[in-house]
Amino acid sequence: MTKTERYLQLRSMIPEMRRIKRIHFVGIGGAGMGGIAEVLVNEGYVVSGSDIAQNAVTDRLCLLGAKIHIGHGADNVQQADVVVVSTAINPENPEIIAAKELRIPIVRRAEMLAELMRYRHGVAIAGTHGKTTTTSLIASLYGQAGRDPTFVIGGLLNSAGTNARLGTSRYLIAEADESDASFLHLQPMVSVVTNIEADHMDTYGGDFEKLKSTFVDFLHNLPFYGVAVVCIDDAVVREIMPRIGRHMITYGFSDDADVQALNFHQQGHQCRFTVRRKGKEDLDLLLNLPGQHNVLNALAAIAVATEDEIDDSAIIQALAEFQGIGRRFQHLGKFATPKGEVMLVDDYGHHPSEVAATIKAARAGWPDKRLVMAYQPHRYTRTRDLYEDFIEVLSQVDCLLLLEVYSAGEAPIPGADGRALCRSIRLRGQLDPIFIASPDQLAEVLPDVLQEGDLLLTQGAGNIGALSRQLAASELGFSIAATTEVKP
């Protein structure tokens, strides 16, 4: 059976959403929203959307046939049968108001994802950290095995050139977002929980116990024959395990893990390790990603693939040839500066644990390099809630350039801004950070800071990623020239 025939057979088994032909997305430029929109375009729905600015996601959707509006306006929703919104959208948005007046159904992003998953074999990946990488690895393993899954990922899968794709099989692999508790809409066949930490606590009323219980509820959305794949190395995940009334597969470095990593060794961007699985032969693996945290992500993917009887040869090849994800320890090249050549890496991590994992991976892979970090805090609330943790983690680099907080629409909070954080790190006495009041000042400061052999790490979830790419392309007047090809 050809891929086309297989897809047509699949479509005949999946009922279309009744009366729904035209779907409008408010905030379509986000990775999660754009990914769902791309799948729906390819399923034949008429898709439109709006966002405040043009970006790579909106450009790609335009090429696929979606109608994109830059800016929000009531007229944009007039022909829609349903309107999809993300949590970031203000309820007073004119398109939301117009949809309510016109009695057009308004659904959250996760509700639309749940609809896509309803008649498929869903694999949902949740957790405070590692969702995007784990989802990407699972999608790559299934693709390598010829399963041709549909996937929706919160970052660009480099090998596919996109963060979403409509496959021809019954599989749908997707991130599950706990930030607004909307992952409770999903009803997958397999659920992964990578870890649980205090983040997005406003959603849970500042109650960590409520957050933990919500993860348990998420796992109980599995059918009684479903599988929960959980990281036993995470203390909070281990704590909630007795409450999970579903079949579980555990993974980690711990001796009691069902899928265990042994003999870990990192060299540069790659890791080697042995995976031990109950009832299966050990596998010696090469992972084309740096850091122990990425080995944990790979173990989750291996556990899911092994449970679904994917051949070991596909696992071995997919991990060794994995091309990475955009903004996840993404190597952008080596560059000549006035004082010598430096290596530029860009990473999305913005929680203290994520930043710590990135620093650890950089130290392990390039132990002789001086680590220079340009860090942009993300959200005032996160900076406030995890202030002491940020002081501890950011003090671990050799040189710190600290940008002002990227607000993500939040109002400033006194004492939780970049200048205050910079002052607190300086008072700790381990590091003397440089405060960057405006992003456009970064390129002015770097030539005086960087030295021969440095590893420059741009870190954060705001517009620091765009700045990093502008640096790589020398678009900010930064007096460097690429000495190696910049990777996408």
Curated annotation (Swiss-Prot):
Pathways per UniProt: Cell wall biogenesis; peptidoglycan biosynthesis
Reactions listed under catalytic activity: UDP-N-acetyl-alpha-D-muramate + L-alanine + ATP = UDP-N-acetyl-alpha-D-muramoyl-L-alanine + ADP + phosphate + H(+)
EC number of the protein: 6.3.2.8
InterPro entries: Mur-like_cat_sf, Mur_ligase_C, Mur_ligase_C_dom_sf, Mur_ligase_cen, Mur_ligase_N, MurCDEF_pg_biosynth, UDP-N-AcMur_Ala_ligase_MurC
Keyword Cell wall biogenesis/degradation: yes
Any one biological process term the GO annotation gives: peptidoglycan biosynthetic process
Gene Ontology molecular function: ATP binding; UDP-N-acetylmuramate-L-alanine ligase activity
Presence of the UniProt keyword Chaperone in the record: no
Keywords assigned by UniProt, alphabetized: ATP-binding, Cell cycle, Cell division, Cell shape, Cell wall biogenesis/degradation, Cytoplasm, Ligase, Nucleotide-binding, Peptidoglycan synthesis
Binding site for ATP: G127, T128, H129, G130, K131, T132, T133
GO cellular component: cytoplasm
Localization, UniProt: Cytoplasm
SUPFAM superfamilies registered for this protein in UniProt: MurCD N-terminal domain, MurD-like peptide ligases, catalytic domain, MurD-like peptide ligases, peptide-binding domain
Highest taxon in the source lineage: Bacteria
Family: Belongs to the MurCDEF family.
Role this protein plays: Cell wall formation.
NCBIfam families according to UniProt: murC
HAMAP family: MurC
Name this protein carries in UniProt: UDP-N-acetylmuramate--L-alanine ligase
Species of origin: Shewanella sp. (strain ANA-3)
Taxonomic lineage of the native organism: Bacteria, Pseudomonadati, Pseudomonadota, Gammaproteobacteria, Alteromonadales
This protein's encoding gene: murC
